[in-house]
């Protein structure tokens, strides 16, 4: 199975929708994805991700299935005490690096001003719910790997979501620290990341990264780019 992860286009965060630029980016992403053999499209329930998914759905004449657990994750203080930059994951990862911490060693997340961040429970939520979703697709989590238990795993699906929730998903699937993924991937608008999993029924498998953070479709072809 191929799982294509796509971040939403340039957003109006206040109204939770795409800006005109975001719609341009989403249309370009749809053209980029039209020949990938996508058989099913999933999306976060948030408007900016769903509107991005609709562009691809229209090109492929498909419907979009919403996955509630892939809404953007929350961050902030869990106890009202001080937390760096309100717990923003990308700012937090950069600050940890500036202090000399390794993002591959999560020991620094256990102490102030990092430990009281609600983002940790959010990441755990995405991990638990993603296991249920992946099992419905034919992949049952066993330890750090996945057992192929389905009969229809030789296909391609797409999931449109957010920088935070997709990083949480990748963190779990790839067995890598969440804050490391925030720094290592940090997806652009409509950036595409592709994972592949073996379809050999009964076997154990782990995801292979085929593409990471590919946003060439909005960096060329006349579509402006804006962070």
Segments predicted by a language model, with ranges:
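Active-site metal-binding loops of divalent metal-dependent hydrolases
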Residues: 9, 163, 213-215
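Flexible, glycine- and charge-enriched loops at secondary-structure boundaries
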Residues: 15, 19, 23, 116, ...
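Alpha-helix N-cap/helix-start capping motif
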Residues: 46-50, 163-164, 189
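Short glycine-rich phosphate-binding loop at a beta-alpha junction
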Residues: 39-45, 148, 156-159
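Acidic, low-complexity terminal tails and accessory targeting/binding regions
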Residues: 73-92, 140, 144-156, 167-227
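Active-site-proximal alpha-helix that buttresses catalytic centers in soluble enzyme cores
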Residues: 2-71
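Conserved histidine-centered catalytic loops in small-molecule metabolism enzymes
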Residues: 39-69, 92-101, 196-227
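Phosphate-handling substructures
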Residues: 61-139
């Amino acid at each position: 199975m191929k799982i294509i992860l796509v971040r939403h286009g340039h957003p109006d965060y206040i109204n939770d929708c795409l800006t005109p630029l975001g719609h341009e980016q989403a249309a370009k992403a749809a053209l980029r994805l039209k020949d990938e053999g996508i058989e099913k499209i999933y999306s976060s329930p948030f408007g900016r991700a769903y509107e991005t998914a609709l562009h691809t759905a229209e090109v492929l004449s498909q419907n979009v299935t919403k996955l509630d657990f892939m809404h953007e994750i929350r961050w902030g203080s869990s106890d009202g005490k001080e937390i760096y930059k309100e717990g923003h994951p990308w700012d937090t990862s950069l600050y940890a690096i500036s202090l000399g911490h390794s993002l591959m060693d999560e020991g620094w997340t256990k102490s102030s001003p990092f430990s009281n961040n609600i983002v940790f429970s959010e990441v755990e939520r995405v991990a638990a719910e993603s296991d249920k979703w992946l099992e419905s697709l034919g992949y049952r989590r066993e330890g750090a790997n996945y057992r192929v238990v389905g009969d229809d795993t030789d296909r391609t699906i797409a999931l449109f979501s957010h920088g935070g929730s997709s990083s949480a998903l990748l963190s779990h699937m790839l067995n890598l620290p969440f804050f490391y993924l925030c720094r290592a991937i940090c997806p652009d608008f409509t950036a595409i990341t592709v994972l592949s999993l073996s379809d050999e029924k009964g076997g154990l498998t782990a995801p292979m990264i085929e593409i990471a953070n590919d946003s060439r479709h909005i960096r060329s072809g006349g579509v402006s780019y804006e962070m």
